[in-house]
Amino acid sequence: DKNAAIPAIRLYNTDVKGIELAFEHSYRARGMRMDSGQDGEAVIIGNGNTATSALAACCMMPEIGHIVVAARHPGKNTGLKPVAEKFVNVHNPYNEIEFGDDQALLEEARNATFVFNPIPVHAADNVADALADAGTEPFSGLLLDVIYVPRPTKLMEAWRAHGGHAIGGEEMLLYQALVQVLLMTGIWDDDPPSDAAQRQQDTTTEDDQLELEMRKALEEAMD
């Protein structure tokens, strides 16, 4: 390629792949496999910028066939639905409810495979309170709360009390940083591949060590 030596600027949203890999790692760490049959439902709390990244990640995960957004600002970010309809290849892949409707949100979360909370610290405490009062029926899905201070969040504690598995924002932070390193060093020489989760499992011993060292450094920085 005669243009190969010409410098170029590329922009990447590493939040997207970071979210996907954080979910994937949680499954692997528990000895589980993610089902690729588009039978899963994802619930996203909020409809701001990070929620957009979360929806993009959901669209790339073959396990997800339906996405529910609990909108804090109904009527804003109207691009979410068209993206879901374009990239999730099922009938009616998107639904939106209001963030303040605790009953509707808990009903969706109870049946969800993945729940993503991208809203600011303490903004989801009312959801945690509603969850704490939701009786004994289990919530079996995986929650990713992007907040990493405090750890765990009130929402994570309530989720775990109902039998669900919850991971904090440090997992997303770690994997988006790992993707950045892979891009900047040329290990991934183009956009993060669509099969990045599988490729992450197939990395070399050196790459495994990189992930371990980055995880250790992150934990030390957050302590």
Question: Can you annotate each of these PLM segments?
Answer:
Residues 21, 25, 56-60, 82, ...:
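Short, well-ordered alpha-helices that flank and scaffold nucleotide-derived cofactor binding pockets
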Residues 63-91:
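NAD(P)-binding Rossmann-fold cofactor-contacting core
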Residues 60-66, 162-165:
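Conserved S-adenosyl-L-methionine
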Residues 1-29, 150, 158:
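Phosphate/diphosphate ligand-binding glycine-rich loop within oxidoreductases
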Residues 13-16, 23, 27, 31-59, ...:
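Glycine-rich adenosine-cofactor-binding loop
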Residues 27-33, 140-142, 146-223:
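Adenosine-phosphate binding glycine-rich loop
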